[in-house]
Amino acid sequence: MSKFLLILLTLCGLGAGPVMAWQDPAESGQEVVDSTAVPVRPDYVRLDSWAGRLNGWTPHILSDLAAILAEAPSHGLPGQERLAEALLDPAIPFAQRAELAGLAALRYAGWLEYGLMEAETHGVRGLYASEAGYLVSRLQDGLDAGDLWPVFAERLPQVRDYDILRAEMLRILALRPIWPEITPGGSLRVGDSGPRVDQLRARLTAERLLLADWQTGAPYDTRLETAVRRYQGRVNLSPTGRLDQPTLRQLNVSPEQRIAQLRANLEQRRWRTRDLGDRHIWVNLADFRLEAWENGRLAREHEVMIGGQASSTPEFTEEMQYIVLNPWWGLPAGSARSRFQSMRRNPSIVDQYGFRIFNASGDAISVYEIDWSRWGNYWPYRMSQPPGPTNPMGEVKFIFPNRHNVYIHDTVERDRFIRTRRDFSAGCIRVQDPLALAEWVLNGQDGWSRARIDDVVAGSSPTVVWLDQRIPVHIAYWTVVGDVDGRVRYLHDLYRRDGRVIADYAALHDAFSGQGLPFPSGLARAGNTVRR
């Protein structure tokens, strides 16, 4: 790589030195580091060794690439303004701009396809040889066709709300200079008036929940109350219609905070597999919601309960293999120990709930055979509960084997679905209207109509139904979501997982935006290194 291009890369954020003018880094005391070598994993490839294989650049394609790079902020990615300017600068020899374009295109395509940050370590996400080869092949196809736009469009995540979140990002970026704020104070309700009511109207107008036809000084009316209710629904608050303190805190979240949250959520979309499955189930834990999708269409929605903070439900993807109608419940160790204390005081509980107790050899024993003085607080037995009206599994469970031992199931506590916040389980996912979900899961499977499902459930025999076609189950934790109607909702960070993701992504985002070194020493805690 030429010294000229190294200097150009440094100036455009593809190099490591924070040189801010057209100046030889050696004269400025800066060391030119060829940061086209990507950090973190030794099996990540150098971008320059692959980008140099791209050919067919023309002034028109360079102009298109500059426009493509200019869209980076809408994707929550670092701004590429200086790169775009360099690509269009006639003072820079065309051959050098073409070489720069190859590096910029490959890096940006990698960001869109795989992300800027590693999902597990939060270090910089580089490219493996197979990934670089694939992207170079697709980029070369675009160069041969004289059009890079479709190539980059194909790199975008396939989750349905990605474009909705992009539109929200553009809206907030545009509003940032004039973001309305509400003066802190007491709650407001219908009939109140004053400057804070005007501020509330201005803020909800910015949220596109009110038309800008209201009069200054007008009292808090039912129209404003309706807008407040709609806003509260967006942020998962109880829809009281009053400006209470939780609602005020959400309304006064700064645009910078919202932008940081959106950037992290857009990045999380890039971490997800691109092939979700023609038929798949999507669970967003932060939204307490399950969605069943078929051929790109939302087929069903279900409310869910998830694990509490002490037993939080993990994020993962696995394939549903079978369902169980009238399932037994194998008590987890924690539940068994708590039941043990109750049974010690009142052994009749075992018969009341139909529990079965098994010793270490797997033999069933009677509760009256247990020598309580021998075991103290230790519980060496397994416990199971057969199907029935008190079985916490309810009428059906959906099994997608995984290392977390998490599955979806019915519940006997169905009245708790009316709550807004539903973190009541021990880690599994309890679903509302589970037999309707079972009907969808078994749709098209010979012999399994809703009528047959109901007939089986009306009995008491456990019945395992293996799926002819496995169904991917994706469990995510996303605190910003876009609904099918285009509405964006900001959700409560129940598990407090957002903070680290937002902070670590912001650090990388700022570094690659030219606000610091692309791989600064301050990020070494994430395992980053810079190699020549």
Q: Language-model segments: which ranges?
A:
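Positively charged n-region of N-terminal signal peptides that target proteins for export
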Residues: 1-4
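Bacterial N-terminal signal peptides
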Residues: 6-15
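Cationic-aromatic interfacial patches
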Residues: 22-131
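Short, solvent-exposed coil/turn linker segments
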Residues: 46, 53, 105, 117-118, ...
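Histidine-centered catalytic/metal-binding microenvironments
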Residues: 110-169
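Well-ordered beta-sheet/strand-loop patches within structured domains
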Residues: 21-36, 126, 148-532
